[in-house]
Amino acid sequence: MICWPYPLLMNAFNNVNMAASCIITSVEFARELGIPEDKWIYPLGGAGMREKDNFWERTNFYSSEALEKSLDSALDVSGLKTEDIDLFDLYSCFPIVPKMAAHHLKIPFLDPPKPITLLGGLTSFGGAGNNYSLHAITEMTRQLRSKRTQANNHKDGRAFNGLILANGGVLTYQHVICLSTQPRSDGKTYQDGNPCPNVVQSVPGDFSDIVGSEGVGTGVWEGIIETYTVQFSRTNEPGIGFIVGRLKQTGQRFVANVGDEKTLRSLVKETGEEVIGKCGWVWKEENGTRNLFGFEKKANL
């Protein structure tokens, strides 16, 4: 286990296959170069957006506005709908990402009718630093070419479309591109500029302040867990817990470390109970700047 709930298998590996390339050119120049038309794959449209860099400024921790708007905008500017896509590659920067994307696109995640990964994502192909999604573009190109060849053999002239979702950070960066075996039927070209704003603009309705390094002040405050993780040691033991939550009295969001062993064990499911939404207590560490959290008042780690 690295950080709960992600074991080593679900974490990114930097040094995997680093080499990939693609050639992007115009129809005129492709003809001038003598590239056979059965090799051509058309980029129809794309979009990209990122969440706020400070994770504690996000609206919630169970969805991604950047992911959803990037997917919707890329499909829209490409003149496509989800049902028009034949192949997906939804990169799993963490396992939650393709689940969230599939949920937003209304694709069954456990038994999808169409492939939602071509290379296997993080588990089978590595992760951060290896430029995964350029590999996805090259693999999508190969598979779309193959589908076109098979269709031509059966006198089927329809277009085949693919969608690639690239992402990185902590659900931070999202980029989507749609590729096709045919140019757009409406004659439109790839759009000028990004249809999305660069950064998510919305903030939580009740988000006015965060309890930061100044701590929660004196006293003990009741708080609700919004999200959490636990960092494990080299000996695979829970080491330090991290909590993001809300103070019940003021609605302020707080960030805290876990203040006692019992709470720490509760976070890693030794009790079998999910703790998101559960109430506990927050206080400022004595002679320190950290907030501490525990299910019992002012417990000690």
What residue ranges belong to the model's regions?
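Conserved catalytic cysteine-centered active-site region
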Residues: 1-3, 9-10, 48-51, 61-66, ...
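Short glycine/threonine-rich loop-to-helix capping motif typified by GTGT followed
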Residues: 58, 92-109, 127-132, 170-182, ...
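Active-site-proximal alpha-helical scaffold in enzymes
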Residues: 22-28, 77-80, 128-151
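Extended, hydrophobic alpha-helical segments in both membrane/secreted and soluble proteins
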Residues: 66-75, 84-101, 137
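Phosphate/pyrophosphate-binding loops at sites that engage ATP/ADP/AMP, CoA/4′-phosphopantetheine
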Residues: 71-84, 108, 212-219, 263-264, ...
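OB-fold/S1-family single-stranded nucleic acid-binding modules
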Residues: 285-301
